[in-house]
Amino acid sequence: MTEEATTTLSSADIIEIMKLLPHRYPFLMVDKIIEIDGDNTAIGIKNVTVNEPHFTGHFPESPIMPGVLLIEGMAQTAGAICAKKDGQPGNLVYFMTIENARFRKPVVPGDRVEFHVRKHKQRGNIWKFHCDAKVDGALVAEADIGAMIVRKDQA
């Protein structure tokens, strides 16, 4: 990706997301990125459907999206910011830390989750983000996460 492309991308469909992230079904937790503001903020979207494999066991009679997958959606949205800024195809963004995770409300099939991520620190290839997950504007989960860009020849 050119420097111009990395700074002008304002949103990303699933094809662009798959260029930025190595994740694939069933572990790609972001369907679309509706907003990217440089390397500072992004909003990712996950459309939750009952057809997702985790709902067969979590929980069959009352399906609830596992909290760890909400965290993963936040991390993938943050990872898209890192990968976009890095601009080097093939490099990986590793999820390093999670702090202050809180789950406020259940997320169920039919919900549209928005992952709001905001960079609050970057030093070299280490990034720190504050993340919120929202459904219909209501906070359902939040966490502070850390990520690291790893060159493909060092992965």
UniProtKB/Swiss-Prot annotation:
Q: Chief subcellular site? A: cytoplasm
Q: Look up the domain of life of the source.
A: Bacteria
Q: Which residues form the signal peptide?
A: none
A GO CC term assigned to this protein in UniProt: membrane
Q: Where are the catalytic residues?
A: 58
Q: Which GO terms describe its biological process?
A: fatty acid biosynthetic process; lipid A biosynthetic process
Keyword check for Cytoplasm: yes
Keywords for this protein: Cytoplasm, Lipid A biosynthesis, Lipid biosynthesis, Lipid metabolism, Lyase
Q: Which reaction does it catalyse?
A: a (3R)-hydroxyacyl-[ACP] = a (2E)-enoyl-[ACP] + H2O
Record flagged with keyword Lyase: yes
Q: What class of enzyme is it?
A: lyase
Family membership, please give it.
Belongs to the thioester dehydratase family. FabZ subfamily.
* Entry protein name: 3-hydroxyacyl-[acyl-carrier-protein] dehydratase FabZ
- The gene it comes from is fabZ
